[in-house]
Each structure stands twice: as structure tokens, then as C-alpha cells.
């Protein structure tokens, strides 16, 4: 009797480590909005997490030059020496942080940096403290790496920022990491030096806890806000802090897929082991382009940030003029995270009662043809995120549609 005759064919069974990870609400909304556009409906999509500017010309030229020089082979595993030197100079110039080249790593986007760090450091059941609202990948990466996300709600009353009291209460002997993002996706909230210091004092008292900071939106801050990163504020924590950044947001290079980080040598070495068996080196062409981005002119960043600030003000003022919505002014990034508690319990023209922020966002999509993302996707309700990385004309039209849709609720 053959094995095939005795073993019944089974369907695919996903590994338990991904059983708690579903399809992202962001992807669901994006897919529905795209389908509606294909049907000819005039949908305005305000869910994109990327700048609407183009990659600077000198960066594109550097990539082209690299291709013509034949720089199309494998590179060093976790970054070319040229890019690591540019990153080292960036950290020193902008953040006052000194790293050796073997304390710097480069990967295929900041998401892979986070994945490498968690995979290299977490044992099953190790805890990672994540303030909510949070970028959706944070908790899923921890789950995949068999860690335990510890979600700490940080609502508008605290400016969507973690407090020292909440951090202290969340730390246990199993805590391995605290993960902070400033400015934040989705809230736009940013930590000043005064906001950070009480948190860093807590971490100094708990030497088993490491800190991962996601600084991806560093250059997109408003109203004279002074960006700082924890390792520059507290040198005593530098040896257990991973400072993550990338070229995607500041330089409009989301598709080039380059993220980087500076941190303790042994952590960086362990992350390289993970990367060696996952993707190996990042794209050689993208790395050459990133050298040009980091070493080249930076003056255009101010103009782009000023454009984002005008759009931020337009959206915040427009949302706060709508009955039932309440929008805090974000310090950075290109998102608003507006409260919508005032519309819960109301009824749509079709007779459906809005019970959650997900219901409200579905109503805006179907009725107003405006795609936004519910706060539940980011771990905090009842809110919704708008990305204002689109034209002012589209934003004005979207705000008019949202206001009209809210007026139709009873």
C-alpha cells in the first residue's frame, strides 16, 4: 500500500505564529476604494502612507549613474560601506549620535529593520510595549516573532503620547522592548525632549528593557517643533537603543525600499544573521540612490514640509468645523487622527446605525466616496486617520463631502 493511498490530502494550514494576523483594515479599505474607482465612482483616497512628491532628480540621477557603472551585483549583506558612511554622517550631523560602521545596518525598508530586530531578540512570550495608536505592522511583527505585544492606550487627553506612569505600570520581568514612534503614524503626535525625559528615567531604572525608536518622519515636523531622538538625550541608554530611520518619507523614496538603523554592535550583528537568511542585501541601485539622498542638498525638505503644513491646517480646520468630529493638531508626519465619538449612535440615510469608527468610515466610503482608515486599525477607537499627502484641491473636496455626509446623519 502506498503512502498516497493511506494519507488523505489536507488543505493548507497556516502556521500558528500567523494565526492571529488577519488582512489589514487599511488593505481592505484600499481594495474596496480601488474597486469603486474601477466602476467609475469618483472616490477620493486619503489612506496613502506616502508623500505625493517625486523623488529628487539628483537622487534618480545617482541611481542611473550606478546602473551605468555596473553597480548591479550583490553588495555587503547589511549595507555598502558608502551608504553606511553616509548614515553615520547623518546621525552625527542631525542627531549628535556617533556610531561605528559595524553599529549601523541597512535593510529593505524600515519594516525589515523592525522585523530583524524582533526576530533576533525575542523568545516566545517576551513582551514588547507598544503605545496605541500604532502603525499596524508593529504588533503583527511581534506576533510573527512569537513575542507578546503589550498595548497601552494613549488617547487624545495625553496627546496620543505614552506617559511615564503608564510605562512604569506596563513593565514586567518579561518586557524586552518599548517601541516608540515620533512623529507618529497614525496620530502625527511627536515627543519633545520634555516628553521623552520622564520615559527615559523609567527605562534607566529597568536595565533589562531595550528601546526601539522609529524616527521615519523626523523631517516632517511643524510650527517650529524641535525633533529629538532618545539616544541623543540620554547617553546612558544608547547601548540598549535601536534608532530606526529611512529615506522613504523625507525623500519621497517609498518604492526604493531602504531603511537603516544605528544600535549596539551585538544587536546589529544578530540582525545581520536574520537578514542573511531572509532577503540578503538590499538593492544595490537603491543604496546608491540613498547615498545621494543623505549626502546631497537638503534645502528642498523645508519647502515640502511647508506644503504639508498648509495641508495639515486645511484638514484640521475643516474637520473641526464638522459637528461630531474633533481633531487634534498634529506636530508632524502627514496624518490627522480625528475623534468621531460625536457621530456614534447616529443613523445613515439608508437606516443603518453607526456603532463604531469602522461603521463611520464605511459610510464615508459608500456615501461620500471618501476613503479614510478607522482608528480600530491602529488599536484605538473611535477615531479615523486621514493622510493629507495629496493635493489641496482633493482635500477641500473631501472635506466638503465628509461635512455633507455628516449632515445627512440623523
Swiss-Prot record:
GO terms for molecular function: 2-aminoadipate transaminase activity; L-aspartate:2-oxoglutarate aminotransferase activity; pyridoxal phosphate binding. InterPro entries: Aminotransferase_I/II_large, AspAT/PAT-like, NHTrfase_class1_PyrdxlP-BS, PyrdxlP-dep_Trfase, PyrdxlP-dep_Trfase_major, PyrdxlP-dep_Trfase_small. SUPFAM superfamilies: PLP-dependent transferases (SSF53383). PROSITE patterns: AA_TRANSFER_CLASS_1. CDD domains: AAT_like. The keyword S-adenosyl-L-methionine does not apply. Its cofactor is pyridoxal 5'-phosphate. L-aspartate binds at residues 47, 135, 185, 385. The modification N6-(pyridoxal phosphate)lysine is found at residue 249. Keywords: Aminotransferase, Cytoplasm, Pyridoxal phosphate, Transferase. GO terms for cellular component: cytoplasm. GO terms for biological process: amino acid metabolic process; biosynthetic process. It comes from the Bacteria. Its EC number is 2.6.1.1, 2.6.1.39. It catalyses: L-aspartate + 2-oxoglutarate = oxaloacetate + L-glutamate; L-2-aminoadipate + 2-oxoglutarate = 2-oxoadipate + L-glutamate. It is found in: Cytoplasm. The keyword Cytoplasm applies. Belongs to the class-I pyridoxal-phosphate-dependent aminotransferase family. PANTHER family: ASPARTATE AMINOTRANSFERASE (PTHR46383:SF1). Homodimer. Catalyzes the reversible conversion of aspartate and 2-oxoglutarate to glutamate and oxaloacetate. Genetic evidence shows that this protein is involved in L-lysine catabolism. It may have 2-aminoadipate:2-oxoglutarate aminotransferase activity. This is Aspartate aminotransferase. It comes from Rhizobium meliloti (strain 1021) (Ensifer meliloti).
Amino acid at each position: 500500500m502506498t503512502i498516497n493511498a493511506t494519507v488523505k490530502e489536507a488543505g493548507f494550514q497556516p502556521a500558528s505564529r500567523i494565526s492571529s494576523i488577519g488582512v489589514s483594515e487599511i488593505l481592505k479599505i484600499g481594495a474596496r476604494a480601488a474597486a469603486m474607482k474601477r466602476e467609475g465612482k469618483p472616490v477620493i483616497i486619503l489612506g496613502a502612507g506616502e508623500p505625493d512628491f517625486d523623488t529628487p532628480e539628483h537622487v534618480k540621477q545617482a541611481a542611473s549613474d550606478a546602473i551605468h557603472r555596473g553597480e548591479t551585483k550583490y553588495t555587503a549583506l547589511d549595507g555598502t560601506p558608502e551608504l553606511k558612511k553616509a548614515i553615520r554622517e547623518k546621525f552625527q550631523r542631525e542627531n549628535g549620535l556617533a556610531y561605528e560602521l559595524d553599529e549601523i545596518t541597512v535593510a529593505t525598508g524600515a519594516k525589515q529593520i523592525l522585523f530583524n530586530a524582533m526576530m533576533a531578540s525575542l523568545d516566545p512570550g517576551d513582551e514588547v510595549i507598544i503605545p496605541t495608536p500604532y502603525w499596524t505592522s508593529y504588533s503583527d511583527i511581534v506576533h510573527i516573532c512569537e513575542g507578546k505585544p503589550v498595548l497601552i492606550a494613549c488617547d487624545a487627553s495625553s496627546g496620543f503620547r505614552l506617559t511615564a506612569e503608564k510605562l512604569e505600570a506596563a513593565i514586567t520581568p518579561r518586557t524586552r522592548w518599548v517601541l516608540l514612534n515620533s512623529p507618529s503614524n497614525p496620530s502625527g503626535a511627536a515627543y519633545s525632549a520634555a516628553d521623552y525625559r520622564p520615559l527615559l528615567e523609567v527605562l534607566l531604572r529597568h536595565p533589562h528593557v531595550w528601546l526601539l525608536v522609529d524616527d521615519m518622519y523626523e523631517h516632517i515636523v511643524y510650527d517650529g517643533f524641535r525633533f529629538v531622538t532618545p539616544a541623543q538625550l540620554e547617553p546612558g541608554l544608547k547601548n540598549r537603543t535601536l534608532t530606526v530611520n529611512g529615506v522613504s518619507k523625507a525623500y519621497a523614496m517609498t518604492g526604493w525600499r531602504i531603511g537603516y538603523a544605528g544600535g549596539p554592535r551585538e544587536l546589529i550583528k544578530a540582525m545581520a544573521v536574520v537578514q542573511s537568511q531572509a532577503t540578503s542585501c538590499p538593492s544595490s541601485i537603491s543604496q546608491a540612490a540613498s547615498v545621494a539622498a543623505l549626502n546631497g542638498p537638503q534645502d528642498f525638505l523645508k519647502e515640502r514640509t511647508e506644503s504639508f503644513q498648509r495641508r495639515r491646517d486645511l484638514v484640521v480646520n475643516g474637520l473641526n468645523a464638522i459637528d461630531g468630529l474633533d481633531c487634534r493638531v498634529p506636530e508632524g508626519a502627514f496624518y490627522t487622527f480625528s475623534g468621531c465619538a460625536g457621530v456614534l449612535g447616529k443613523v445613515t440615510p439608508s437606516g443603518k446605525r453607526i456603532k463604531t469608527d469602522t461603521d463611520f468610515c464605511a459610510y464615508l466610503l459608500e456615501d461620500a466616496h471618501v476613503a479614510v482608515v478607522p482608528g480600530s486599525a491602529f488599536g484605538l477607537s473611535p477615531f479615523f486617520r486621514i493622510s493629507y499627502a495629496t493635493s489641496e484641491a482633493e482635500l477641500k473636496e473631501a472635506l466638503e463631502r465628509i461635512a455633507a455626509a455628516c449632515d445627512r446623519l440623523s
